Amino acid sequence: QQRTATVQELCEALDASESTIRRDLNELDRMGKVNKVHGGATLPDSQFLADEPTMAAKEALAVAQKKCIAKAAAALITAEDFVFLDAGSTTLALVRELNGPALDARYVTNGVAHARTLAQKGCKVFLLGGLLRPETEAIIGAAALYSLQQYNFTKAFLGANGVALDAGFTTPDPEEAAVKATAVRRAKEAWFLVDDSKFARVYPAVITELHGGAILTNRCPNPKYKQYTLVKETEE
């Protein structure tokens, strides 16, 4: 598969004028479908993946970055908040960083480790019922979705295995994606906690498009993401 094409090649292949091709390339570049280069365009270098590390393996990755993101996320929570936390490793790091007024907020989670840690901190926590997925220790399935639909959240904090301009926020498992997507819809504010290694990665199950949630990251490697959603960086 050819990943790079010149304007002239596209004109000949599509039997279109140069002005039409350039206009279309501008629009595709804005959408994140291609990257404009001098005289043509290339396909974005999004990496398609499908593997799912265990929760223990995830916790060992990008530890310093996750801690910075977690601290910034914890600072967004007030005592009056009603918060959803999904079963990601970065959201678990967030739970460990909770202090002060954030301890008086109320929490709903589908993460077993999250619920246990919240309870140990003295927080009021509701654990969703449903099917336990061993790989991520997440509660999923119809019962979890039904429970989620009974709540309205002031804030939701979620993880994603990948975030890409052309694919939005994605994850390997469709059932986990369904829980995350439902939480996004039920929240006034939805924050995706993703370290810089997650950018330009695409997984099989879509959570939401890029404009569906704000991004809290240690570093955003591509300024184009800021054209579609709010991006907060801890390394600014």
State each model region's role.
Residues 66-74, 91-92, 145, 177:
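Short, well-ordered alpha-helical scaffold segments within catalytic/effector domains
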Residues 61, 65, 86, 106, ...:
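Short, well-structured alpha-helical patches and their helix-loop capping segments
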Residues 83, 89-92:
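Gly/Ser/Thr-rich loops at beta-strand to alpha-helix junctions
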Residues 4-10, 15-17, 30, 36, ...:
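Conserved phosphate- and dinucleotide-binding cores of soluble alpha/beta proteins
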Residues 1-8, 13, 19-84, 96, ...:
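HTH-adjacent hinge/linker in prokaryotic transcriptional regulators
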